[in-house]
Each structure stands twice: as structure tokens, then as C-alpha cells.
């Protein structure tokens, strides 16, 4: 029996591939028989098309859930490409955490799994009163998937992120590594093994580099190739019960 459950997708930094991983994870779970829905509560850096604001990250979501409108994946759309608290201030908008939480629960009622994507890393402010994404994660108390980029510096960034979550007693589902460019496989493997030893955290999978990720996400065969080696057993433990 599938549990109705949310997962929080966070990253070690901005531009590490959270949206790519969230999109892939959506289809990965759907392939496992789980009705998964990607959701980014606050989208900053939205573009405008006439009077309509277009969320760039949600456009990627729509490639894997094309039956939904691009505006269905966010609660707040903000134009400035900066931290949500500042983008909201610049737009004279107040971000209401209770509205976001209510939206999460409504989505949970409609889907088996809701994949909640944060912005930047753990300590990016969500509101200007000092409430950060890690505070929101603590409030939701759902399993967290950490996206880490396979690049120089990833050991420090990943270990610090894991330690910050452990300090808050947040449930950690595991780490997904995203290859942003073709790198040295010896260095990449060493980084992964070092992180595994230092954090004792499950490695859920890897996303190999793709020069045209939008084309890949829109194609079933190409998309499945990116997550073919993900840890299905671990995910089954997280989303199923007797």
C-alpha cells in the first residue's frame, strides 16, 4: 500500500540541479506506481510573457507532468532572481507560511507523494523574519533528499548540509549526486566515498551529465536512462508499507 507522503528536495547550494532531480524523481516514482507531484512553493526569477508570469522551474516540471498547467506547481511566483524573502519584498508581497503548508497538505490528499523543492540551500531565508527553509523542513518533518553537485568543494558543502540537518533531527532519506559537467571519474568517485564515510548517509543515486536536459526530460527512454541505477530498494522502503 502506498503511503501518502511528502519528500523535501534541498541542495548544498544554488544551481546544483534540484529541479532536474525533482523532475526525474517524479517520473522515477511514477514508474514505481506512485502518483508523484513536483511542487516548488516559491519560484523567484520567473519570466513574464505579456501579463502572465512563467515559472522556469515549473516548465521543467511540466515536461514530466504535461497534464498540468505550468502555473499548477507553485504557490508564489516572483520576478526577481534572488532569495525568496528579498524577491517578495521587492514585489511588495508577503509570503505566508501557513498558505504554503496548507497547499502541501492539499496536494498530499490528491497525490501519493509530493516532492517539495526548496530554493538554494538549507539556510536560504523564506521570509524576512529570519525563517529559513531548514525551519520549514523541520516543521514539515518529512524525509529530505539532498542534491549535491559532483564538483570541487562538494565534500565540504555536502557534509555541512548533512550535519545541519542532523542537528535539527531531520529525517534524511539520502543523497543524490548530480553531474553538472564531465569530470574526472577518479576524483568524483573519491568524493562520493568520502562523503559516504563522513556522513553515513545513503546514496540514492547519480544523475549523469546531459548537455540538453530539457530534451532528455521530455523523452521517456532518455529520461529513464538517467535514473536507471537509482536505489529502488531504498525508495520502496521510504514510500511503501504493509
UniProtKB/Swiss-Prot annotation:
Functional pathway: Cofactor biosynthesis; biotin biosynthesis; biotin from 7,8-diaminononanoate: step 1/2
Residues annotated for Mg(2+) binding in this entry: 19, 117
Any GO BP annotation: biotin biosynthetic process
A family per Pfam: AAA_26
Active site (record annotation): 40
Record key words, sorted: ATP-binding, Biotin biosynthesis, Cytoplasm, Ligase, Magnesium, Metal-binding, Nucleotide-binding
Subcellular location(s) of the protein: Cytoplasm
Required cofactor(s): Mg(2+)
InterPro entries named in the record: DTB_synth_BioD, P-loop_NTPase
Reaction it catalyzes: (7R,8S)-7,8-diammoniononanoate + CO2 + ATP = (4R,5S)-dethiobiotin + ADP + phosphate + 3 H(+)
EC number per UniProt: 6.3.3.3
Single GO MF descriptor: dethiobiotin synthase activity
Residues where ATP binds: 15-20, 117-120, 178-179, 208-210
Gene Ontology, cellular component aspect: cytosol
Annotated substrate binding sites: 44
Family per similarity comment: Belongs to the dethiobiotin synthetase family.
Purpose of the protein: Catalyzes a mechanistically unusual reaction, the ATP-dependent insertion of CO2 between the N7 and N8 nitrogen atoms of 7,8-diaminopelargonic acid (DAPA, also called 7,8-diammoniononanoate) to form a ureido ring.
Record note on quaternary structure: Homodimer.
Protein name: ATP-dependent dethiobiotin synthetase BioD
Amino acid at each position: 500500500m502506498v503511503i501518502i507522503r511528502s519528500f523535501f528536495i534541498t541542495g548544498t547550494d544554488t544551481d546544483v540541479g534540484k529541479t532536474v532531480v525533482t523532475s526525474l524523481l517524479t517520473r522515477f516514482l511514477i514508474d514505481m506506481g506512485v502518483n508523484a507531484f513536483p511542487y516548488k512553493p516559491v519560484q523567484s526569477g520567473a519570466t513574464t510573457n505579456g501579463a502572465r508570469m512563467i515559472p522556469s522551474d515549473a516548465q521543467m516540471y511540466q515536461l514530466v507532468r504535461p497534464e498540468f498547467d505550468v502555473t499548477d506547481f507553485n504557490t508564489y511566483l516572483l520576478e526577481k532572481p534572488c532569495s525568496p524573502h528579498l524577491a517578495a519584498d521587492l514585489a511588495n508581497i508577503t509570503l505566508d507560511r501557513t498558505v504554503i503548508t496548507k497547499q502541501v497538505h492539499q496536494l498530499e490528499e490528491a497525490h501519493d507523494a509530493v516532492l517539495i523543492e526548496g530554493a538554494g540551500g538549507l539556510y536560504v531565508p523564506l521570509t524576512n523574519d529570519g525563517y529559513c527553509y531548514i525551519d520549514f523542513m523541520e516543521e514539515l518533518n518529512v524525509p529530505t533528499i539532498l542534491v549535491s553537485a559532483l564538483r570541487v568543494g562538494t565534500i565540504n558543502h555536502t557534509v555541512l548540509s548533512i550535519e545541519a540537518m542532523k542537528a535539527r533531527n531531520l529525517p534524511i532519506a539520502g543523497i543524490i549526486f548530480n553531474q553538472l559537467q564531465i569530470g574526472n571519474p577518479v576524483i568524483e568517485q573519491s568524493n562520493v566515498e568520502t562523503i559516504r564515510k563522513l556522513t553515513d548517509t545513503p546514496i540514492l543515486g547519480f544523475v549523469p551529465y546531459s548537455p540538453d536536459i530539457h530534451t532528455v526530460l521530455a523523452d521517456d527512454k532518455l529520461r529513464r536512462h538517467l535514473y536507471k541505477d537509482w536505489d529502488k530498494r531504498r525508495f520502496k522502503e521510504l514510500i511503501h508499507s504493509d
